[in-house]
Amino acid sequence: NKFAEVFNNIIFDTNKYSEIEIKDKMIEIINSKIETYSNLALYYLIDKKLVKNQNEIKNLFDKVISNTKDFEHKNLVIFKKALYFSDKFNEIELLEILNPLINSESVWKSHALYLMAEYFYADNQNQKAKEFFNQIISLENSNIDLRLQAEKRLNRDLSE
């Protein structure tokens, strides 16, 4: 696979390329629609801070999400998008991103609920935080660690 080769050449020999070349090649990989390498290229760009424009990052996430076929893999990318923007977006924008997870039976649902609960808790919106923490606890298939964290937060910080 040509794109696998390009990706590996870049990450194992970054000194051969300028930042602009790396960015352009990674975006080319994202546009290739090859799931594994599109994801890796996006995370590389973000990790190395090669894309500064938040709107461009949002668009790159959207491309990767739309090209990801596997349900849970797509949901993971959606969650990572929300996580990335959690300190940049308001609650409406975050909920827009996370609604596909919150309204599904995805394994990432409890993670999405936890992110929103912590978002509201950090913003002193304790009633909303409680609602999201309680949803995690009442979920049948919620992540065990997140359920414990939600219970701790409710008992320690949000009890009346």
What residues fall within each predicted segment?
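Alpha-helical transmembrane signal-anchor/signal-peptide segments
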Residues: N1-T14
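TPR-repeat structural position
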Residues: F3, K16-I20, Q54-N55, E91, ...
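A ubiquitous short alpha-helical element
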Residues: N9-F12, Y44-L45, A117
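Low-complexity, Pro/Thr/Ser/Glu-rich flexible segments characteristic
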Residues: N15, I20, D24, R156-E160
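Extracytoplasmic/periplasmic/luminal assembly and interaction segments
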Residues: E19-F71
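Soluble extracytoplasmic domains of inner/organellar membrane proteins
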Residues: K49, V64-E160
